[in-house]
Regions:
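Alpha-helical scaffold domains
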Residues: 1-176
Length: 176
């Protein structure tokens, strides 16, 4: 499988790799693909992550068991492309109240306020912060205040959209 990931992948090649790993009977291939996300060859690792972002919902469930590992990787990742792809994978996962990690909440809050961070990562962190903090009114209030703070700076259209979407959800919670 590694040789398939060593070059630029087309959309049809991504779909072929998704089909190859589809279904529970191919969980061993999903694990092989996941291990390739850790490969020393950046192209291989990025392509493997990219394939996971295209998994259908049923196959994406397999990644739920990797939830904490993916969060740990976010906390350490310095490559913005890999980080963006891992955050995309996490956006497709549930954040249960009893399993929320404060270190990841802190990570998301720090990234969404970092004007030097890429817009896509900031937008993803806005969404992920909400998914984690929505269980507690006091944390939602903290997120609302943080979002109000960044609203004064120039935001890209994508970042502004994420901001508006999450603010609408926060305000609809009727805690204010």
């Amino acid at each position: 499988m590694k040789t398939l990931l060593t070059h630029h992948l087309s959309q049809s090649e991504i779909m072929q790799l998704c089909a190859l790993t589809q279904g529970e009977h191919n969980d061993n291939l999903k694990e092989e693909l996941y291990q390739l996300t850790l490969d020393a060859d950046r192209r291989v690792a990025v392509n493997a992550l990219w394939v996971f972002t295209h998994f259908v919902a049923d196959d994406n469930v397999w990644l739920f068991a990797k939830h904490d590992q993916l969060i740990d990787r976010c906390l350490k990742e310095r490559d913005t492309t890999k980080l963006r792809l891992i955050l995309t994978m996490l956006l497709r996962q549930p954040f249960e109240e009893e399993a929320v990690r404060t270190d990841f909440i802190d990570f998301c809050l720090a990234r969404l306020t970092d004007a030097r961070a890429p817009y896509a990562i900031r937008a993803q962190c806005i969404k992920l912060a909400y998914e984690q903090m929505r269980h507690w009114p006091e944390l939602l209030d903290e997120l609302r205040q943080t979002l109000e703070m960044i609203s004064c700076e120039p935001l890209s259209p994508g970042l502004r959209s994420a901001w508006r979407h999450v603010m609408k959800k926060i305000l609809s919670c009727n805690v204010y």
